[in-house]
Amino acid sequence: MTESVLDYMSRLGRDARAASRLLARAATAQKNRALLAAADALDAARAELSHANEQDLAAGRANGLEPAMLDRLALTPARIDDMIEGLRQVATLPDPIGEIRDMRYVPSGIQIGKMRVPLGVVGIIYESRPNVTIDAASLCLKSGNATILRGGSEAIHSNQAIARCIQQGLAEAGLPAAAVQVVETTDRAAVGALISMPEYVDVIVPRGGKGLIERISREARVPVIKHLDGICHVYIDVAADLDKAIRVADNAKTQRYAPCNTMETLLVHAGIAERVLPPLAAIYREKGVELRGDAATRALLGADVLEATEEDWRTEYNAPILSIRIVDGLGAAIEHINTYGSQHTDAIITENFSDARRFLAEVDSASVMVNASTRFADGFEYGLGAEIGISTDKLHARGPVGLEGLTSEKYVVFGDGHVRT
């Protein structure tokens, strides 16, 4: 690359801005045609995708990448199938662009409503997983946004191969190539440039480790849609149904350990702890979950429960480790969650309607649940189709970010020669 990284990124930004204006007025059928053509291109390019991915895997092994990172990097046949199906699924989702709602007449006689419109240009910064290239590109395309994708250097060949399939889909639908651009330099300065171009980029969505997201949040000159941690809680109320409590608390922790919506701390009302914790602890022990608890929990469950420290309450383990605290009541549970939680997803297990309502009202999280596992906090499970990420911020998008989260609204006003007096 002969041009500087800054010049290169500025060129991508200019091209994306121009493409975004064309995408904003593209018909739904045209966008869907691009998505379906890209899916067909992926299907036809399986050998090419596998070859490119093997280059990345070989480099990763040579560079000492951890097994978990190599697993995330791998494009297995099943994952290619999922990417193809993901593109086709997004094509079936309702197009939010152009929808007008809340139309009303005001005393002056004019009619006012809100129209849903694209954000413009979305920058996506992510690590390892090549499938994110498809998730992000498909959602941005369907919502009328141009996107600049900066994947991890460890996945550069895989991302470039995927991008070629997307470009083929765009070309077949008559959409600009710059609607979806993959950053082709592995120079880390590209990230700094991407997050510092408010004239070209309207929002950044980082997906990766906490260090990456903290850096982007600190340095970005454009808005960021993000979440830092997934410190999720389940609170078992004194009025909980025991079978529901055990089933939900088991699933919330052990269904998968790595996702950001996995429970990390279990809170239990003192009035039900002796009935619910021993059978739950037996399940956790059988599944190899390390338990850490406060003094009351250790007294009840035995010395093999490690002492929970202040740091444990603030930790997202992403591992078979669970912190447990016995609390005096609902108020103490809410206080704990709002003090130590990450405003991601928290659940109460109770048959008491008033307690459920209070929990919903007072827990300050993006998703708050009653008698359901925190593992449901996901765009697909919420009926949004694919998601571009989960936001714990309070402005613009909160919770799983699907198509609607990648849009904004503008006021539209209709009159008949009306003038203000």
UniProtKB/Swiss-Prot annotation:
Catalytic activity: L-glutamate 5-semialdehyde + phosphate + NADP(+) = L-glutamyl 5-phosphate + NADPH + H(+)
Domain of life: Bacteria
CDD domains, A to Z: ALDH_F18-19_ProA-GPR
GO MF terms held by the record: glutamate-5-semialdehyde dehydrogenase activity; NADP binding
Enzyme Commission identifier(s): 1.2.1.41
InterPro entries with a match to the protein in the record: Ald_DH/histidinol_DH (IPR016161), Ald_DH_C (IPR016163), Ald_DH_N (IPR016162), Aldehyde_DH_dom (IPR015590), G-glutamylP_reductase_CS (IPR020593), Glu-5-SA_DH (IPR012134), GPR_dom (IPR000965)
Keyword set, alphabetical order: Amino-acid biosynthesis, Cytoplasm, NADP, Oxidoreductase, Proline biosynthesis
Biological process (GO), any one: L-proline biosynthetic process
Compartments, as annotated in UniProt: Cytoplasm
Entry's Gene Ontology cellular component terms: cytoplasm
Pathway: Amino-acid biosynthesis; L-proline biosynthesis; L-glutamate 5-semialdehyde from L-glutamate: step 2/2
Function as written in the Swiss-Prot or TrEMBL entry: Catalyzes the NADPH-dependent reduction of L-glutamate 5-phosphate into L-glutamate 5-semialdehyde and phosphate. The product spontaneously undergoes cyclization to form 1-pyrroline-5-carboxylate.
Similarity comment: Belongs to the gamma-glutamyl phosphate reductase family.
UniProt-recorded name of the protein: Gamma-glutamyl phosphate reductase
Organism: Pseudomonas paraeruginosa (strain DSM 24068 / PA7) (Pseudomonas aeruginosa (strain PA7))
